[in-house]
């Protein structure tokens, strides 16, 4: 198996050159989420549970953003292999129009009916009242985030992974500073509490959008052809919908599944402790997965570009095998490191910092151990689904393999243990991670067939 790791000189330098900035970008983004959680936790566990519940529908918006972004990257990475700037501009134009429409409507719903939506997600009305002001504003921020994320995705697919890292570093510093000022009322500003976190995020997203707009006009690496951007044509719309709509549905269904896990925890007898522990460990788990997300995104760029360049079927297969084995080994190393930190750092230092004591700390420990043990499985499935299958244009199977195990295994098993059997939280934590046990072998079987390799830039003639 390790024989496949032998590659031409410079390959791993190139791989890490793509992975590093993307991983740092994800680290910055997840650190922002962690800082949000930390500052809100200082207000109390009830406030943190309210924000966690409010973020359930927001996570669906994030999933839509990521879905459109991923659909765009499929086309851009392969067109970049051909250096076809006109079609790249058309693809970005279609993505911007569709993405705006897909985020404006849910953002409006969240703004108009925040309490009613919150009441659907928890049996605790106090959380709904506390979280509503946050929910009203945070939805609007993702309209701007959609547009900036699309431009970042296009730059990344054109092998410029550093742009997103710099943009989100700037945004994170701004957001964190505004969080501190507006949540706690520093420097003469009003103490807005939870609502302050939403205002800070909205202002940071608007700034991101402004910077991306300026760079899109001035960029030499990826010069957008504005005529093609504003008039992308029906052929590009058809092609984008064909390859991106399954990805958008995939991410939306996956996001809904993750949101349902939070809803299940919100209906347990100890919902405040469950939600508080899940909020903290959700962010900490993602911090350890940033390298895996980076490798997955780098895999998508490399595979997509290779197909666009016209490499042979066997070359692409060998390349995918190398990338997947390497990612799984990196995941195993991260598991060893993270498990060492549970008794030495998380339990004695991190959990008290987030005001997690007693039952909340015990639940967080269970979520930490089960989550960290699953990192190699998550690492493989991230690269398999978002890197190999999607970049190869195999969007139907990538959707089925990503969503199926979650909805058919993890969700019903977690609901059964948490709500019906009232099982111990260790069993519930294990059930949350169970989808990867099914996803990994199914992904491996699909990739082994080689039927996932498609050149999505080729226009088929009528009658063919």
Residue ranges and their predicted role:
Residues 1-22, 76-141, 189-245, 303-374, ...:
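Short alpha-helical transmembrane segments in multi-pass integral membrane proteins
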Residues 7-38, 42-43, 59-71, 75, ...:
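N-terminal transmembrane alpha-helices
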Residues 17-36, 137, 171, 204-208, ...:
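Transmembrane helical elements of multi-pass membrane transporters/channels
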Residues 22, 26, 37-38, 74, ...:
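Transmembrane alpha-helix boundary and packing residues in multipass membrane permease domains
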Residues 27-49, 118-125, 181-192, 252-287, ...:
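Helix-terminus/linker motif at the lipid-water interface of multi-pass membrane proteins
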Residues 29, 33-36, 40, 62-69, ...:
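Alpha-helical transmembrane segments and their lipid-water interface positions
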Residues 48-108, 145-164, 275-342, 379-398:
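Small-residue-rich hydrophobic transmembrane alpha-helices
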Residues 69, 73, 138-157, 164-172, ...:
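Short runs within selected transmembrane alpha-helices of multi-pass transporters and secretion channels
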